[in-house]
C-alpha cells in the first residue's frame, strides 16, 4: 500500500514541477525579455505592493531595470506583463495605438469600472475618441476660458474659507472632496448640498484597493473598494435614470450628452455611461488632490519656493483695476513660476506606476518579442528621474524648469500619458491646481501641523495624511 502512496506523491510532485516550470517559462513565439514570473498564481504581486517610503521610482521597477535592463517580463495578479522603461519603445507603443496595442487594465481596474467585454474601451474602436471628444468639450481649453475657470475659483474660495473654521484638517482629503464635488457636478449633475454621500471619501477608498489582489471576500481591501464602488455606481445610475426619464432636465454635463447619444452610438449603454463617469471622476480627483497635498508638503520642507510664487501672484493682483475681480484666462496663462512649480510637483508626484496597454500582435524589439495578448506597462517616470535631464532628480527644485527647453520637456516629461492617449483632462487638472495656488497664496496663510510622509505601494499616497491650519490674511 505504501508503494501506491509513494507513486501518488511522485506523480503529484511531477505535475506540480511541470506546472511551476510552465508558469516560469511561458510558451511564446520568439524570445521574451529577461525577467521572472514569480510565484504561481500571484506572480510578483507582493513585491509590487511592497511599501516604499520615497518619491523615487518604486524598487520593484528600479531594481529590475538594474538587473534586467529597461525591458523586462513579470507577472502581476496572475497576468503576464512586459514592463518597459525604454524611451524608444515607449514612444513606438504610443504611436502604435489601434494597430499594435490597445488600452488595457489590470483585473482590479476592470472589475472596478466594468471595463470588461463590450464595455472595455479599446483603440481599434472609436469609443475612446467619443469619450475624449465629449470630455474635451466639457473640460477643454474653450470651456475653461468661458466658464470653468470662474467656477473653479468659486469652488476653491468656498473650500478655503471653510477650511479656516475647521482648525486642523487633512489637506489631501479636503482637496479630494473639493475636486470631487466640482467634477461630479459637471459629470453627472451631483449636488453635494442635497446629497448625503461623501464623494471624496468614496474616491479615497478606491485608491486603497485599485492594485490590491482582486480577491472579493470580506476583510480585504478589494472587497471594501468594491462596496464603495457600488455606492458611487448607485448614485450615478439614479441620476442617469432621472435624466433618461426627463431629457429636458439637462444640466449641460456629461450625462446630458451621453443620454442624447444613447440610441445613436452602438457601444453606448447605461452601464457604459456609468463606468466612464466613474473612471473620469476617479482620475480627476486623485491626480489633483494628490498634487495639492504634495504642494503643502513641499511648502513646509522648502519654504524658499514661496518667494517667486508670492511675487508672481502679487504682480497679477497689482495689474488689476479691482484686486477682487475674478482670475482671467490671460492671467492664468501668464503664471510662469506657478507652472514651473506645478511641473516639479507632478514630476516627483506621479500617482501611478505606469500606463497600461495590451499587445494586439507579436511586437519584435531589439531581439525580443512582446507576445500578442500580453499586458504592457509603459513606465515614463524613469524619464523624470533621469539625472542627465533633471540634475539631482530627487531634489525638489522648480527653478530647474527655467533652463529646460520645450522640446526636451516634451520628450522627457509625460505626466499625462503620450501619443493619442494623452489625458483629456490635463488642462483641467493644471488649471484647477494653478487656481488653487493663486487663491491660497494671495489671500491665506497656512502651516503644516503634522503628517506629510509619503509612500509608493506602488501608487503614491500619504501614510499619515498632511494636516494643516489655514487662516485668512488681513487686508
UniProtKB/Swiss-Prot annotation:
This is Beta-amyrin 16-alpha-hydroxylase CYP87D16. It is found in: Membrane. Heme binds at residue 423. Belongs to the cytochrome P450 family. The gene is CYP87D16. Its EC number is 1.14.14.171. GO terms for cellular component: membrane. GO terms for molecular function: heme binding; iron ion binding; monooxygenase activity; oxidoreductase activity, acting on paired donors, with incorporation or reduction of molecular oxygen. It is a single-pass membrane protein. Keywords: Heme, Iron, Membrane, Metal-binding, Monooxygenase, Oxidoreductase, Transmembrane, Transmembrane helix. It is an enzyme of class 1 (oxidoreductase). Involved in the biosynthetic pathway of maesasaponins, which are oleanane-type saponins with diverse biological activities. Catalyzes the C-16alpha oxidation of beta-amyrin to form 16alpha-hydroxy-beta-amyrin. It catalyses: beta-amyrin + reduced [NADPH--hemoprotein reductase] + O2 = 16alpha-hydroxy-beta-amyrin + oxidized [NADPH--hemoprotein reductase] + H2O + H(+). Pfam families: p450. The chain crosses the membrane at residues 3-23. It comes from Maesa lanceolata (False assegai). One of its GO terms (biological process) is brassinosteroid homeostasis. Its cofactor is heme.
Amino acid at each position: 500500500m505504501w508503494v501506491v502512496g509513494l507513486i501518488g506523491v511522485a506523480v503529484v510532485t511531477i505535475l506540480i514541477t511541470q506546472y511551476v516550470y510552465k508558469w516560469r517559462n511561458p510558451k511564446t513565439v520568439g524570445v521574451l525579455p529577461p525577467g521572472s514570473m514569480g510565484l504561481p498564481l500571484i506572480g510578483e504581486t507582493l513585491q509590487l505592493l511592497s511599501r516604499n517610503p520615497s518619491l523615487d521610482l518604486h524598487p520593484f521597477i528600479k531594481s529590475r531595470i538594474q538587473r534586467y535592463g529597461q525591458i523586462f517580463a513579470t507577472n502581476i495578479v496572475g497576468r503576464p506583463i512586459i514592463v518597459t522603461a525604454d524611451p524608444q519603445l515607449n514612444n513606438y507603443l504610443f504611436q502604435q495605438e489601434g494597430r499594435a496595442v490597445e488600452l488595457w487594465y489590470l483585473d482590479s481596474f476592470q472589475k472596478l469600472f466594468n471595463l470588461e467585454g463590450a464595455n472595455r474601451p479599446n483603440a481599434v474602436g472609436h469609443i475612446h475618441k467619443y469619450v475624449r471628444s465629449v470630455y474635451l468639450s466639457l473640460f477643454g481649453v474653450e470651456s475653461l476660458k468661458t466658464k470653468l475657470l470662474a467656477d473653479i475659483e468659486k469652488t476653491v474660495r468656498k473650500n478655503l474659507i471653510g477650511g479656516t473654521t475647521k482648525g486642523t484638517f487633512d489637506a489631501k482629503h479636503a482637496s479630494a472632496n473639493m475636486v470631487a464635488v466640482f467634477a461630479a457636478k459637471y459629470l453627472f449633475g451631483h449636488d453635494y448640498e442635497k446629497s448625503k454621500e461623501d464623494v471624496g471619501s468614496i474616491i479615497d477608498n478606491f485608491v486603497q484597493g485599485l492594485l490590491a489582489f482582486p480577491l472579493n471576500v470580506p476583510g480585504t481591501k478589494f472587497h471594501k473598494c468594491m462596496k464603495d464602488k457600488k455606492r458611487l455606481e448607485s448614485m450615478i445610475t439614479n441620476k442617469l435614470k432621472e435624466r433618461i426619464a426627463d431629457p429636458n432636465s439637462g444640466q449641460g454635463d456629461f450625462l446630458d450628452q451621453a443620454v442624447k447619444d444613447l440610441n445613436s452610438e452602438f457601444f453606448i449603454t447605461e452601464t457604459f455611461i456609468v463606468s466612464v463617469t466613474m473612471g473620469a471622476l476617479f482620475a480627476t480627483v486623485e491626480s489633483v488632490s494628490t498634487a495639492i497635498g504634495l504642494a503643502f508638503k513641499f511648502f513646509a520642507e522648502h519654504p524658499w519656493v514661496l518667494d517667486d510664487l508670492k511675487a508672481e501672484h502679487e504682480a497679477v493682483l497689482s495689474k488689476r483695476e479691482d484686486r477682487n475681480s475674478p482670475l482671467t484666462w490671460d492671467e492664468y496663462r501668464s503664471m510662469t513660476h506657478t507652472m514651473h512649480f506645478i511641473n516639479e510637483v507632478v514630476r516627483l508626484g506621479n500617482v501611478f506606476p505606469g500606463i497600461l496597454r495590451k499587445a494586439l500582435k507579436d511586437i519584435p524589439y531589439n531581439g525580443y518579442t512582446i507576445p500578442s495578448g500580453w499586458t504592457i506597462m509603459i513606465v515614463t517616470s524613469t524619464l523624470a528621474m533621469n539625472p542627465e535631464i533633471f540634475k539631482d532628480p530627487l531634489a525638489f527644485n522648480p527653478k530647474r524648469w527655467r533652463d529646460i527647453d520645450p522640446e526636451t520637456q516634451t520628450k522627457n516629461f509625460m505626466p499625462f500619458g503620450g501619443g493619442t492617449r494623452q489625458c483629456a483632462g490635463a488642462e483641467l487638472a493644471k488649471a484647477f491646481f494653478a487656481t488653487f495656488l493663486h487663491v491660497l497664496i494671495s489671500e491665506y496663510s497656512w502651516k503644516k501641523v503634522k503628517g506629510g510622509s509619503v509612500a509608493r505601494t506602488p501608487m503614491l499616497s500619504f501614510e499619515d495624511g498632511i494636516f494643516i491650519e489655514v487662516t485668512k490674511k488681513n487686508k
